A protein has these predicted regions:
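Short aromatic/hydrophobic contact patches that present stacked aromatics
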Residues: 17, 106, 168-170
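Short beta-strand boundary microenvironments
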Residues: 74-116
């Protein structure tokens, strides 16, 4: 079944995702930054050789985009990440264009987004969070759920949605 395959390829035995107690999804989760800092500094969290925690604090929000070649809109997940997100999820790799710049209103689009939504091609602009965001790259994640997301700088996305809190810690 396609849904089971997607869920299996999105997760990993090598990391865990922390959400708020009773949150049924990343979107419903709210973690304050202080709690996230406590989590990433726990001794169970793997570390880079320089001692930094191997973790990614993330904001996950839903936006609406116009469908490509059809009428109507549909929900798309936007994920604000830290640099470690790419080491924690090695299946996510840029296949076209380039990585977004940290501190910029730029995003990379999952391969599944580019064929289904308007404005999701390299060089195009997507409006969300009260601003225009430039799509600078396309990524593939081996058919995982991430292929249906837009990714950008955690701080830029949190700022655009006026989010002082986080959604998850991976």
């Amino acid at each position: 079944n396609g849904v089971q395959k997607t869920l299996r390829s999105t997760g990993s035995d090598d990391y865990m995702i922390v959400v708020r107690k009773a949150a049924m999804s990343e979107i419903m989760s709210i973690l304050d930054r202080e709690a996230a800092s406590i989590i990433v500094n726990m001794p169970q969290v793997a570390r880079y050789p320089d001692g930094r925690p191997m973790s990614s604090k993330e904001v996950v929000v839903i936006i609406n985009l116009n469908k490509l070649g059809a009428e109507g809109i549909s929900n798309v997940t936007v994920r604000g990440v830290e640099e470690a997100a790419f080491q924690l999820r090695p299946q996510v790799r840029i296949t076209q264009g380039r990585m977004f710049r940290w501190g910029a209103r730029e995003v990379i689009a999952g391969a599944g987004i580019t064929t289904r939504f308007q404005g999701a091609q390299i060089g195009e602009k997507v409006k969300f969070g009260g601003d225009l965001w430039t799509v600078v790259g396309i990524f593939d994640s081996d058919g995982s759920g991430f292929d249906s997301e837009l990714w950008g700088d955690l701080n830029q996305i949190a700022d655009a949605f006026k989010r002082a809190s986080l959604s998850t810690v991976t």
